[in-house]
Amino acid sequence: MTKPRLFRLWLVLGSALMILLIIVYWDNVGTAHFYLHTSLSRPHILEPLPTQGLVEENVFTSDVDEFLDTLLSSDAKHNDLSRRKTEQPPVPAPSKPVLSHMEENVRGYDWSTHDAHQNPDRDRQQAERRSLLRDFCANASLAFPTKDRSFDDIPNYELNHLIVDDRHGVIYCYVPKVACTNWKRVMIVLSESLLDRGSPYRDPLDIPREHVHNTSTHLTFNKFWRRYGKFSRHLMKVKLKKYTKFLFVRDPFVRLISAFRSKFELENEEFYRKFAVPMLRLYANHTSLPASVSEAFSAGLKVSFANFIQYLLDPHTEKLAPFNEHWRQVYRLCHPCQIDYDFVGKLETLDEDAAQLLRFLKVDSQLHFPPSYRNRTASSWEEDWFANIPLAWRQQLYKLYEADFVLFGYPKPENLLRD
């Protein structure tokens, strides 16, 4: 064999070996390195790593952290570029002494304990809510679909309610009809994901409603696959371990009443065509219906609350499509048995919980939660709304939403479930 051929052979073999080494390295980064990070504790219970012996590990940890930080920070960079954002506020360096970079920082955020000015009674209430949630997730007596699956079993499209703020290390699972418009506004301010004439919004109430519910405004978990491919689940787990996760819930029956009022008692073209027309045909025996919601309302054609309950209980409804997010169960939106939430807020105590959460996140000096809407649906209205609903339907409806009642500590509405 001539020398040129030998040279080409060695070149091919060397290139193949190099490619193999690169593949092995990235596979290791995607597994062992990421699981090293996911083993870290939550932000509010972090303990300092020992400072002795860190010198020998610095090369390894800095390599891992550089790769992880690059992935984590690419979220914000992608959003910034897509909105033609030219400046990013500098992140202050942590003032605390010598702790591992891996332990202390995700994109430079200070993960010290969030306990400033906390109210012991409200802290106790939070602990009770979270404990109740964990206990029933582990309790075999409460059974509901999806309870026993793992986080990896959740389809990507079911993670679309988890909004991520990388600047402050926050994940919010939004539940429609539970103050989600204002919490989305808060997340926009914190993440600086939307600009107003070149500058990030500072006041949540300044953000137009049409932008708040635009899916392109928020970074959600279901978008990770397109950005990170095989690393997406690993990265989600890193953030779920490191970030503060919260959600707000509401009495399930009151939430249904609120959804009905806003989507079917007010003129809503989208919900009329997609939901009201089929309901009126199936449950109110209307065969010829106007093309627009305004014409239907003028003719006195409206979905009744009983029609809405029939729709929810009809076994054929979800054979066609999953429940709309406005009446889908919270356990299906936010996966509370797969995600260990750090804060569980309730609409019934919204003002107090919002203030406590902003202190917990250490952002209470930056913004205030917008004032709550005082004309919202009240729990005292339940008996009036369900007065004309047959008892058997009420009992079936409770079974449909029982998991939400139990997991989040809402009492069983006995007055509605018996004659």
UniProtKB/Swiss-Prot annotation:
Which lineage ranks, top first, belong to the organism behind this chain?
Answer: Eukaryota, Metazoa, Chordata, Craniata, Vertebrata
Q: What is this protein called?
A: Carbohydrate sulfotransferase 12
The family classification in the record reads: Belongs to the sulfotransferase 2 family.
InterPro entries (alphabetical)? Carb_sulfotrans_8-10, Sulfotransferase
Topology, Cytoplasmic side: 1-5
List where the protein spans the membrane: 6-26
> What is the enzyme's main class?
transferase
PANTHER family in the record: CARBOHYDRATE SULFOTRANSFERASE (PTHR12137), CARBOHYDRATE SULFOTRANSFERASE 12 (PTHR12137:SF4)
> Which residues does the annotated region (Disordered) include?
78-99
Return one Gene Ontology term, BP aspect.
Answer: dermatan sulfate proteoglycan biosynthetic process
* Chain intervals with Basic and acidic residues compositional bias: 78-87
